[in-house]
Amino acid sequence: MLTHLDDQGRAHMVDVGDKAVTQRQAQAQADVRMQPATLDLLVAGELPKGDVLATARIAGIMAAKRTADLIPLCHPLPLSSVAIEIEAHPAQSLLRIISTVRCTGRTGVEMEALMAASVAALTIYDMAKAVDRAMVIEQVFVRNKTGGARGDFQHPLTPLDTSE
């Protein structure tokens, strides 16, 4: 059943008023594949537009906070934290963005995590396109989520993190 449709098939915002307030967390990932020389410039901080990685982190955080303004039917959520990690993977010639979003609320933060990772990737593309127009944004997905009535989720493409 699609929760965003009423009994007549019309879109509506899901009523979460009766759901329990719980700790929620979601992680999302986006990869930006690029030429090896572009990755070297990014990691060294030598692109003409400045510190691309710091700008991408800030853009991702801002995007998570604006998710309800951009995705129809998303609830505005009081986010507790948004973290953006950007890892260089030279062997695959890509940057991997992992966003982690937390809140205490009645609905999950998967969309906020996806927005954060996606907009961070778009920012990297925007700031590096002058040197590499062939970059590809790929593998955008929810890695995991915790909290809520439907329980935890771990995407099969990501290893289980047991460090916490």
UniProtKB/Swiss-Prot annotation:
Binding site for substrate: L73, C74, H75, M111, E112
Record-listed E.C. numbers: 4.6.1.17
GO terms for MF: cyclic pyranopterin monophosphate synthase activity
InterPro entries in UniProt: MoaC, MoaC_bact/euk, MoaC_sf, MoCo_biosynth_MoaA/MoaC, Mopterin_CF_biosynth-C_dom
NCBIfam families in the record: moaC, PRK09364.1
BP GO annotations: Mo-molybdopterin cofactor biosynthetic process
Keywords: Lyase, Molybdenum cofactor biosynthesis
Function (record text): Catalyzes the conversion of (8S)-3',8-cyclo-7,8-dihydroguanosine 5'-triphosphate to cyclic pyranopterin monophosphate (cPMP).
PANTHER family the record matches: CYCLIC PYRANOPTERIN MONOPHOSPHATE SYNTHASE (PTHR22960:SF29), MOLYBDOPTERIN COFACTOR SYNTHESIS PROTEIN A (PTHR22960)
Domain of life from the UniProt record: Bacteria
Record's catalysed reaction(s): (8S)-3',8-cyclo-7,8-dihydroguanosine 5'-triphosphate = cyclic pyranopterin phosphate + diphosphate
Active-site residues, as the UniProt record annotates them: D126
Keyword Lyase (UniProt): yes
Pathway given in the UniProt record: Cofactor biosynthesis; molybdopterin biosynthesis
UniProt-recorded name of the protein: Cyclic pyranopterin monophosphate synthase
Quaternary assembly: Homohexamer; trimer of dimers.
Annotated Pfam families: MoaC (PF01967)
Family according to the record: Belongs to the MoaC family.
Signal peptide: none
